Amino acid sequence: METPAYDFDSLTDLPPLPPSDFTPSNAFTFPDHNLDFSFLDSTLSLLNRHHLSESTRLEQIFYDSTHTQLFHNDDTTTTTTPFLHLPDLKSIDAVEEPTTMKLFPSLSPPLPAAKRQKLNSTSSSTTSGSPTASNDGGIITKRRKISDKIRSLEKLMPWERKMNLAMTLEESHKYIKFLQSQIASLRWMPLESVYNTAGEVGETDLLKSLTRQQILQVLANSPGSRNVLSSRGVCVFSYEQLLSLKTMSRNL
């Protein structure tokens, strides 16, 4: 029996194939509008898609430009569609470098080792050098002031003896108290004596020739007399003051 021959001018004249030939065994069909996405997902899984999805720039390149190139079914297209490939990372960095550096400064390329070492040395010298120098200058100034005050106390003393710091402070305290008492006594002392004290005090010829003001001036300018008075804990006062003290003590 002869099989009849059919002549077809083009593929469009062929009879349609039964749908059962294109149906999978598990009866799962792919809609036409999800076909391109399923192919794209399977391709991206080979390229470690979970790493590519972290970069917004790569997602934009793959889902915009590649999608339109791979799945553009146009009868007028004469060139073959290229296969999915990774973009030029160097060109992407060159284009996106300013935006990346502005948004993520930590992702900017590291500085050279020599320049980084120079910056670190400059910052360390700036932060650690100035406070130490200022502190040293303040300590030196305080020590100088303390030394000047101690020398002033030593000059105030009526004697010239080498003493340590503790002895200098103790003796200066005693001598300052003596000076305060002596000043209070001289402030209320009469300038001229109103009593004849030749028989009671036992004045010598030298004392008789001097006035009260001259005698006080001699005592003030004599380191020996001040040393004796301060060491005994007494001060100079007049005869009038002595009589006043006796009168006050009797009335008490």
From Swiss-Prot:
Listed GO MF terms: DNA binding; DNA-binding transcription factor activity; protein dimerization activity
Subcellular location(s) per record: Nucleus
Subunit structure: Homodimer.
Residues of the bHLH domain: 130-179
Name of the protein this chain belongs to: Transcription factor bHLH117
Gene giving rise to this polypeptide: BHLH117
UniProt keyword annotations, A-Z: DNA-binding, Nucleus, Transcription, Transcription regulation
Alphabetical list of Gene3D superfamilies matching this protein: Helix-loop-helix DNA-binding domain
GO cellular component: nucleus
InterPro entries on file: bHLH95_bHLH (IPR045239), bHLH_dom (IPR011598), HLH_DNA-bd_sf (IPR036638), IND-like (IPR045843)
Keyword Transcription (UniProt): yes
Compositional bias (Low complexity): 121-134
Superkingdom of this protein's organism: Eukaryota
Organism placement in taxonomy: Eukaryota, Viridiplantae, Streptophyta, Embryophyta, Tracheophyta
UniProt region (Disordered), positions on chain: 103-141
